[in-house]
């Protein structure tokens, strides 16, 4: 079974013309939808991987609503919005009226009344972004910047853009390994869904049983489970290392971090089992010496910093595409090169 089949296609994410209205999850979107995001992001990068500014959202207001701490995701969304000439407001949730007992609905309705065009939302509760898009502020474009263990769609798309740009191979021809804390990782879920939707036929998930989600067998024929890391990464084109999500683990899942590194840490010896041109990725933040050795994180096969740059391009694309209908009305959509 395809992972997308585990969920009802999200009618909330697309408008009546089939264009992106909200970006909440990978599930429910087609290969064409995802390719459109990738192609749009590509248009914001030159041949030297430098970002290209375009004033497509001039006069629009983007509000970053981060109910969970974040550095990389929040700042790249802010950078993306500013490169599109949008006004950006970072709402300090800890000091907002929600800390004084105001409901989430009332907080969001007040922010919507301030003429916000886009909310970028990170929340600890799975499904929070979908709830806001469907039941609270349907007129504001909602971009999910991570909700609990559920989804991190822009991270998945920046990972897909990095894979496409760096391997220069069709997804159908790639072997991709995802290693680490799969159970608690929204990145893993979104990456698997995106890889499947884009046609990857060899997705390898490598983890101890304690860090695998329940019902893993339902993820599909093209997803294989490995408890043995050496076996799992042999012949891979892409390796995505994930950190252990200690903040989401209710009970001990590992005997120790040193034991995890011994069994699942990516080092030079293990990387040599993959293809010679294998690329190494990590969504960050990294725990060096736990899931990845510094020599690999900083090595020639690492594209981790390129992921950060690609993340800005992808978030520019998602922000612009969420306003696509209005941009078309203004005759600006041609500048996105769709």
Curated annotation (Swiss-Prot):
Pfam families: OTCace, OTCace_N. The keyword Transferase applies. Carbamoyl phosphate binds at residues 72-73, 122, 152, 155, 284-285. One of its GO terms (molecular function) is aspartate carbamoyltransferase activity. GO terms for biological process: 'de novo' pyrimidine nucleobase biosynthetic process; 'de novo' UMP biosynthetic process; amino acid metabolic process. Keywords: Pyrimidine biosynthesis, Transferase. It catalyses: carbamoyl phosphate + L-aspartate = N-carbamoyl-L-aspartate + phosphate + H(+). L-aspartate binds at residues 100, 186, 243. GO terms for cellular component: cytosol. It is an enzyme of class 2 (transferase). Its EC number is 2.1.3.2. Heterododecamer (2C3:3R2) of six catalytic PyrB chains organized as two trimers (C3), and six regulatory PyrI chains organized as three dimers (R2). Catalyzes the condensation of carbamoyl phosphate and aspartate to form carbamoyl aspartate and inorganic phosphate, the committed step in the de novo pyrimidine nucleotide biosynthesis pathway. Belongs to the aspartate/ornithine carbamoyltransferase superfamily. ATCase family. This is Aspartate carbamoyltransferase catalytic subunit. The lineage of its organism: Bacteria, Pseudomonadati, Pseudomonadota, Gammaproteobacteria, Moraxellales.
């Amino acid at each position: 079974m395809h992972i997308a089949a585990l969920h009802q296609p999200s009618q909330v994410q697309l408008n009546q013309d089939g264009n992106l209205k909200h970006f909440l999850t990978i599930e429910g979107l087609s290969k064409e939808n995802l390719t459109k995001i990738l192609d749009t992001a590509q248009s914001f990068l030159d041949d030297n991987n430098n970002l290209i500014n375009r004033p497509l959202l001039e006069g629009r207001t983007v509000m970053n609503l981060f109910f969970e701490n974040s550095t990389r995701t929040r700042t790249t969304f802010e950078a993306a919005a500013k490169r599109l000439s949008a006004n950006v407001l970072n709402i300090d949730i800890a000091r907002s009226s929600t800390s004084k007992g105001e409901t989430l609905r009332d907080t969001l309705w007040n922010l919507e009344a301030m003429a916000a065009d886009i909310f970028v939302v990170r929340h600890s509760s799975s499904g929070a972004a979908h709830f806001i898009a469907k039941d609270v502020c349907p007129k504001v474009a909602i971009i999910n910047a991570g909700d609990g263990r559920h989804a991190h769609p822009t991270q998945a798309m920046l990972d897909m853009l990095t894979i496409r740009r760096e391997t220069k191979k069709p997804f159908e021809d790639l072997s991709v390994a995802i290693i680490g804390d799969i159970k608690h990782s929204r990145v893993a879920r979104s990456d698997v869904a995106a890889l499947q939707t884009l046609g990857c036929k060899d997705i390898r998930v490598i983890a101890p049983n304690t860090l695998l989600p329940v019902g893993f067998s339902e993820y599909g024929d093209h997803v294989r489970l490995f408890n043995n890391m050496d076996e799992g990464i042999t012949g891979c084109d892409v390796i995505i290392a994930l950190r252990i999500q200690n903040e989401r683990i209710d009970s001990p899942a590992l005997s120790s971090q040193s034991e995890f590194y011994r069994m699942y840490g990516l080092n030079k010896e293990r990387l040599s089992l993959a293809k010679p041109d294998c690329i190494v990725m990590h969504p960050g933040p990294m725990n060096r010496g736990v899931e990845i050795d510094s020599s690999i994180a900083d090595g020639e096969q690492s594209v981790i910093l390129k992921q950060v740059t690609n993340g800005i391009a992808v978030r520019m694309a998602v922000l612009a595409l969420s306003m696509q209908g209005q941009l078309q009305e203004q005759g600006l959509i041609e500048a996105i090169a769709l």
